């Protein structure tokens, strides 16, 4: 998939990745003590998408191949036509292992609202079963199920991928949520609004206690 907008989060992410990547990388690293400790001394983050030379292409089911990492998300965990990633990047760990960064960009709060839109009953069954197993395994009450499906579905499915990559495929993975503060290309959102919103989202999803959040990087630009 290709970026088409010339405003908002997609546009801003592409601008930073292609024109200010060193600065962008520093903002990501300073937002996560854990990643800073795990990345090697060169502190290099290599961006795979969205790149100008690739027409700002975004990737979907083949994202691991694009990152040069072996493995796949099986269809009994998530159906085909899974998440489209705003950005992909990778780095080397202290022992030479691959670290991958799955990136989502936001420029205003309404971008964070999402709901399950799968039309195939088989797909819906797989998604709900995967969500339910994740919640049970992590001590999350089923009273939050509706919020996962109808309010913050995008974040919920990103957490599934983050968990599977780290704990089943043993691929060191971070979910980087890049938030553009006071975006002057579209809709302005203050830092305080972002902070309050994420606190509210984590509470409403019942995930405030998750150790997996150590692999979620909230970056404000």
Where would I find each of the regions flagged by the language model?
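Conserved catalytic cores of phosphodiester-cleaving nucleases, focusing on short active-site segments
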Residues: 87-89, 99-107, 158
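Short loop/turn segments at strand-loop or loop-helix junctions that form parts
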Residues: 102-109, 178-182
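Active-site metal-binding core of divalent-cation-utilizing nuclease and nuclease-like domains
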Residues: 56-95
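Non-catalytic C-terminal interaction segments of nucleic acid-processing enzymes
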Residues: 156-221
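Short catalytic/ligand-binding loop motif for oxyanion handling, primarily in non-cytosolic enzymes
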Residues: 96-97, 109-114, 183-187
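Charged, often low-complexity linker/regulatory segments
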Residues: 1-46
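Acidic, metal/cofactor-coordinating or nucleic-acid-engaging core segments within structured domains
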Residues: 112-174
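Short, solvent-exposed loop/turn segments that connect beta-strands within catalytic domains
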Residues: 93-98, 168
């Amino acid at each position: 998939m290709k970026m088409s907008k010339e405003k908002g989060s997609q546009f801003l992410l592409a601008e930073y990745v292609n024109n200010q990547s060193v600065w962008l990388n520093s903002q990501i690293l300073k937002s996560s003590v854990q990643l800073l400790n795990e990345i090697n001394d060169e502190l290099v983050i290599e961006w795979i998408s969205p790149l100008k030379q690739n027409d700002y292409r975004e990737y979907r089911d083949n994202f691991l191949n694009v990152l040069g990492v072996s493995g796949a998300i099986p269809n009994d965990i998530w159906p085909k036509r899974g998440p489209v990633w705003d950005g992909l990047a990778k780095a080397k760990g202290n022992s030479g292992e691959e670290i991958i960064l799955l990136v989502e960009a936001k420029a205003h709060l309404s971008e964070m609202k999402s709901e399950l839109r799968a039309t195939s009953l088989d797909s819906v069954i797989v998604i709900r079963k995967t969500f339910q197993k994740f919640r049970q395994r992590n001590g999350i009450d089923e009273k939050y199920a509706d919020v996962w499906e109808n309010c913050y579905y995008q974040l919920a499915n990103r957490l599934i991928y983050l968990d599977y990559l780290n704990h089943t495929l043993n691929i060191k993975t971070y979910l980087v949520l890049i938030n553009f503060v006071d975006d002057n290309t579209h809709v302005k959102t203050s830092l305080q609004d972002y902070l309050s919103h994420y606190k509210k989202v984590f509470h409403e999803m019942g995930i405030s206690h998750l150790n997996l959040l150590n692999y979620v990087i909230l970056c404000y630009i």
